[in-house]
Amino acid sequence: ALGGLAEKYDLKVIEDAAHALPCSYKGRAAGSLGDVGAFSFYATKTLCTGEGGMVTTDDDAIAERIRTMRLHGISRDVFDRYQSEKPSWYYEVVAPGFKYNMPDTAAAMGIEQLSRAKLLRERRQSIADYYNSQFSGLPIDLPPAAATGDEHAWHLYVIRLQGINPRRDEFIQALADRGVGASVHFIPLHVQPYWRERYQLKPDDFPVAYDVYRRCVSLPIYTKMSDADVERVADSVKLVLASFEQN
């Protein structure tokens, strides 16, 4: 649908694939579904360089435009200090630009991890599979599964507590008391002070988003978790839920 609209109105499709490396959707790699794909390599992402990210495209003109914009609008053609006849200190700004270039050290870490990207995803998949098997039948909603033939990145593993009073904050604290760190992803924008005050919003203005927020808990899922770590998280979740049912 988006592709058809883009073609009709001569638009470019930018795909937010921040968490999706190295997954595929309907046989196509994440980041290749539009004209441009954008990935994040922040510390919590499936491939990490500390900071930074990656842009993919098969359009040479877009690629060159991105290369120029990422470093203050400096053209790589005129910034080649090793082949140009101009002095080494010389450069030209050919367009408005930004400071978006990744440090070489971060890029080197990312290139090395690319060779292990599928292996890292498979470890996350195995953790998610274990959680799913352990949590089946409990009073929680499990994360949506990927469609047949597609892949899930498992950047996060988010459960939703059931019931009229989900007691989410108590649940997270009870896990913490057992040495299991859990978090919430994410807090809806309409309850954040800036948007709430600017647009005079109330929590119930977006009831579905607010209800999911009240119930959601992100459990630990990262590639360096040992099997014992994963089992301890699952056991702790079951014990805390059992204690809630008794109170």
Regions found by a protein language model. Name each.
Residues 1-3, 8, 24, 60-247:
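PLP-dependent aminotransferase class I/II
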Residues 10, 15-49, 89-94:
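Conserved active-site segment immediately N-terminal to the catalytic lysine
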Residues 15-16, 51, 104, 220:
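Acidic active-site catalytic centers that drive phospho-/nucleotidyl reactions
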Residues 18-19, 42, 51, 67-71, ...:
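Histidine-centered beta-alpha loop that forms part of the nucleotide-sugar donor binding/catalytic region
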Residues 32, 44, 56-57, 218, ...:
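Ser/Thr-centric signal marking residues that sit
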Residues 40, 53-58, 111:
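Short beta-strand-to-turn element immediately C-terminal to the catalytic PLP-Schiff-base lysine
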Residues 51-52, 117:
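Short active-site oxyanion
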